[in-house]
């Protein structure tokens, strides 16, 4: 539960429009105004995923730290890893404002930001100043007006290869027209082939193989999930991130804001994204790493993602409502779960409810 000081801070931030509040939170992290809420290290929560050693399974999702301004500050407040971006080769302003909306009754957010970011150059300069030990992923995308979107992803791999601990190819944002078309089998095959070829080329140059994940939408058909699973396995991708925001608006209480165009995130996304996670786990088998995202607001929801097939989890929107102590509270809660269930590793619960979530009608 959110503490008294965080409650007051939230009330203050909610006096501002969402984008202004986001900027203030970045400034607070930059200036050290956010106290560390990190939980003690717990070996039962440590995970080896895609060749990387994660100190705990709770990460900051892409979208918060778009321009790599505060990755190390986020790690200090309790996240085991963080993901910057989405970054595009050239700076772009994104869509017209207003483009970010709070659904307070639902503890949700709708955004139609449109990959607003300062471009590769600005993010790269900041990441070069970070510790090489910091577990920072780079989420790469394509410029809205790009003549060759696949080339933009390849450029992202090459530009950030020396500083990224892992990459995420974001082809599932609903806010860049036509981007989700890259999830179609033929387009996906071309994209993954190009991205992985660039990765192998860069790995040969520097002697370090950086994992590549694919972030997918929660609004896929069964056939779409089949195609993605088949292509990911055929091409030898390192993992999936499930899922991005949804276009669905089922069971929302805030009907006024629900009519806004854009992707929905936060608590209402939990069931849908977790069901898609389980269905993808069923399709790809037990070995492919999956990061579960969508509606993670507590230790229990984080654990449920793991039970549904996730190796790691990420969050963002729920921290808007729960405050910066949320990652530390989740990590403490997962340690407590290990105590209660006498687990040697949190991994022991993985896949234990895949069948339940696969059958969930969402």
UniProtKB/Swiss-Prot annotation:
One of its GO terms (biological process) is 'de novo' UMP biosynthetic process. GO terms for molecular function: dihydroorotate dehydrogenase (quinone) activity. It comes from the Bacteria. It catalyses: (S)-dihydroorotate + a quinone = orotate + a quinol. Coiled coil: none annotated. It holds the Pfam family DHO_dh. Keywords: Cell membrane, Flavoprotein, FMN, Membrane, Oxidoreductase, Pyrimidine biosynthesis. Its EC number is 1.3.5.2. FMN binds at residues 62-66, 86, 139, 170, 215, 243, 266, 295, 316-317. The keyword Flavoprotein applies. Substrate binds at residues 66, 111-115, 170, 175, 244-245. GO terms for cellular component: cytoplasm; plasma membrane. The active site is at residue 173. Pathway: Pyrimidine metabolism; UMP biosynthesis via de novo pathway; orotate from (S)-dihydroorotate (quinone route): step 1/1. It is a peripheral membrane protein. Binds 1 FMN per subunit. Its cofactor is FMN. Belongs to the dihydroorotate dehydrogenase family. Type 2 subfamily. Monomer. Catalyzes the conversion of dihydroorotate to orotate with quinone as electron acceptor. This is Dihydroorotate dehydrogenase (quinone).
């Amino acid at each position: 539960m959110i503490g008294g000081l965080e409650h007051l801070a939230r009330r203050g931030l909610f006096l501002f429009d969402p984008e202004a509040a986001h900027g203030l939170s970045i400034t607070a992290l930059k200036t050290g105004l956010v106290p560390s809420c990190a939980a003690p290290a717990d070996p039962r929560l440590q995970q080896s995923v895609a060749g990387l050693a994660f100190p705990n399974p709770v990460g900051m999702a892409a979208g918060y730290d778009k321009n790599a301004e505060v990755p190390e500050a986020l790690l200090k407040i309790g996240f085991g890893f963080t993901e910057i971006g989405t970054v595009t080769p050239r700076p772009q302003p994104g869509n017209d404002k207003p483009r970010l909306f709070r659904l307070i009754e639902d503890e949700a957010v709708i955004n139609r930001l449109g990959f607003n970011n300062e471009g590769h150059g600005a993010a790269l300069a900041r990441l070069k100043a970070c510790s090489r030990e910091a577990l920072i992923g780079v989420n790469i995308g394509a410029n809205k007006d790009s003549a060759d979107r696949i080339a933009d992803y390849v450029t992202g791999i090459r530009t950030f290869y020396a500083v990224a601990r892992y990459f995420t190819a974001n082809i599932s944002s609903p806010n860049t027209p036509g981007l989700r078309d890259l999830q179609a089998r033929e387009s996906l095959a071309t994209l993954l082939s190009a991205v992985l070829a660039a990765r192998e080329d860069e790995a040969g140059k520097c002697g370090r193989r950086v994992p590549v994940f694919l972030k997918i939408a929660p609004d896929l058909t069964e056939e779409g999930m089949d195609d993605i699973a088949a292509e990911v396995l055929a091409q030898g991708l390192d993992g999936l991130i499930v899922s991005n925001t949804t276009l669905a608006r089922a069971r929302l209480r805030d009907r006024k804001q629900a009519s806004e165009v854009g992707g929905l995130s936060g608590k209402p996304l939990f069931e849908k994204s977790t069901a898609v996670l389980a269905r993808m786990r069923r399709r790809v088998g037990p070995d492919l790493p999956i990061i579960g995202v969508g509606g993670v607001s507590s230790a229990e929801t984080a654990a449920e993602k793991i039970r549904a097939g996730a190796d790691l989890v990420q969050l963002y929107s729920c921290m808007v409502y729960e405050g910066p102590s949320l990652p530390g509270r989740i990590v403490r809660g997962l340690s407590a779960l290990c105590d209660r269930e006498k687990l040697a590793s949190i991994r022991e619960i993985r896949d234990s409810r895949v069948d339940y979530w696969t059958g969930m009608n969402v």
